[in-house]
């Protein structure tokens, strides 16, 4: 299933995922939509920057993939679909330096996301995640009850991410798989300090097993059917992994 689509979320949750991860950006007219890239050309049949397109423009786009009927969903549509499947949501806020839509002095994407969470009454488990610590700090100010997760790239040691998370009060650290597997003792240290650990992305059985062996709390994957099967087998064998996502 194509990424960041309602159909993809339903498929992942039906395959055994407990939650889905998706990315949120704002249209030119301020509507939060679920799309990863700043430019729509990779994932749809259109072109242009999300923040320069109105929702009506986004609605005319078709998501690339086997099913040409899929569209870019609004955040509200995504939340309703996830709630109907009794799933959770890891919502990544796209507001980082270097992004064409980056706002250094505002958090419009975050604010719109929090409004939609309240308006839709989404009651499933939720985490607001971002690579931008300032975004997460603003989330604490606006909605202290919402857990936050700090994302980090390959080049950032997970121990550094954990240090920031402990200082800023984040519920999760979310390093890349490569970085986490290269770290020593980070998962145990995080758990000792009441911080949970997820990793992105694990798309083969061996990697999922290695992460489960480390005791991670969540595994982000593009293949939920595979990850769920590996986790099920791991638990059957007496493993200590908690959950695959």
Language model features: what each stretch is:
Residues 1-245:
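Phosphate-group recognition and catalysis centered on beta-loop-alpha active-site segments
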């Amino acid at each position: 299933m194509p990424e960041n689509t309602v159909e993809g979320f339903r498929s992942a949750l039906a395959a055994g995922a407990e939650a889905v991860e998706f990315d949120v950006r704002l249209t030119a007219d301020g509507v939060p939509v679920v799309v990863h890239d700043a430019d729509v050309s990779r994932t749809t049949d259109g072109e242009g920057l999300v923040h320069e397109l109105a929702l009506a423009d986004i609605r005319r786009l078709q998501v690339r993939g086997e099913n040409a009927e899929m569209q870019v969903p609004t955040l509200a549509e995504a939340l309703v679909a996830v709630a109907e499947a009794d799933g959770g949501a890891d919502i990544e806020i796209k507001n980082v330096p270097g992004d064409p839509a980056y706002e250094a002095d505002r958090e419009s994407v975050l604010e719109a996301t929090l409004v939609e969470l309240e308006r839709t009454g989404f009651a499933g488990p939720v985490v607001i995640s971002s690579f931008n610590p300032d975004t997460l700090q603003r989330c604490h100010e606006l909605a202290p009850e919402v857990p936050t997760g700090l994302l980090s790239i390959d080049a950032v040691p997970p121990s550094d991410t954990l240090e920031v998370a402990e200082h800023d009060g984040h519920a999760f650290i979310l390093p890349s798989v490569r970085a986490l597997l290269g770290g020593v003792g980070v998962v145990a240290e995080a758990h000792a300090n009441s911080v949970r650990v997820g990793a992105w992305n694990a798309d083969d059985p061996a990697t999922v097993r290695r992460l489960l062996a480390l005791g991670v709390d969540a595994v982000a994957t593009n293949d939920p059917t595979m990850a769920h099967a590996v986790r099920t087998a791991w638990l059957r064998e007496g493993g200590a992994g908690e959950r695959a996502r």
